[in-house]
Amino acid sequence: MTTAIVGVGNIGSTVARHLTAGGESVVLAAKDLSRAQALAEELGPLARAASVEEAISEADAVLFAVWLDTMRELIREQADLLTGKVVIDPSNPIGFDASGQLMRTLPDGESSGSIVAALLPAEAHYVKAFGTLGADALAVSANRDPLAVLFYATDDDDADKTINRLIRAAGFEPWKAGGVDAAGRIEAPAGDLHQYGFNGEVVDLARARTATAGSRA
C-alpha cells in the first residue's frame, strides 16, 4: 500500500515521518517539489517525491495536508484521479484575523469535512483524520504508553479499514467519532473531540470512549 501526502508543511511532514517509521510507503508532493524531495531523502527508502498528479496516480490513499481552500482547488483539478482512492482530510476551518488571532472560517454548524466530502467523485472513499491534534502534539505523541488516540470520521467501509491501518502505523490508537456528520466534532476551533476541546490534552482510549459514549456510530 502507498499513501500520497500532498503538502509537506507541519502536518504533512509529521504524518510522513510517523508512517515511514511504522513501515508504510509514502509518495510526497508539494507546490515546491524541492521541499518534497528533501523530505523524501530524509525519510529514506520508504519515501519518494513526485508531482501531485503522479503521487495521486500511484497511491492507494491520498492525504491532502493543505489549507481548506487549497484542498478545494486540488480536488477540482484532480477529481478524475481521485476515483477509487481513499481520501484523507485533516483540514480544519480555521484562519487568522488581521490581528493574528485564530478565527473560524466557516459558518457555525458547517464542517470542512462536509464540504470536502461533497466535492469528491462518488467513487472516492472519504475519511476525516489526522487533524485532531495540533502539529506539535502530533509530532511528539506517537507510540505513547498508553497510545494517544486519533479520532476519525467516515461513512465508508474501505476508508475505515485504511485509516485504522494508517493511524496504527503512525503510532496512535484509532477511534471513530462517527460518520461525516460527526466531522465537526473533530475539527478546530470548537469541536469537542479536537485537542482544543480537551483543553489541549492528548487523550487515551479510555478518555475517548467516555467522550463518545452514546454517540459513536
Positions of predicted regions on the chain:
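Short beta-strand and adjoining strand-loop segment in the mid-core
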Residues: 101-109, 114, 140-158
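Rossmann-like NAD(P)-binding element
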Residues: 44-86, 92-100
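NAD(P)+-binding Rossmann beta1-loop-alpha1 motif at the extreme N-terminus of oxidoreductases
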Residues: 1-45
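Active-site-lining helix/loop region of Rossmann-like oxidoreductase modules
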Residues: 148-217
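Short, conserved loop/helix-junction motifs that constitute active-site signature segments
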Residues: 78-84, 119-121, 144
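Rossmann-fold dehydrogenase core element
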Residues: 106-130
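Short, well-ordered coil/turn residues at beta-beta hairpins
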Residues: 65-66, 90, 129, 153
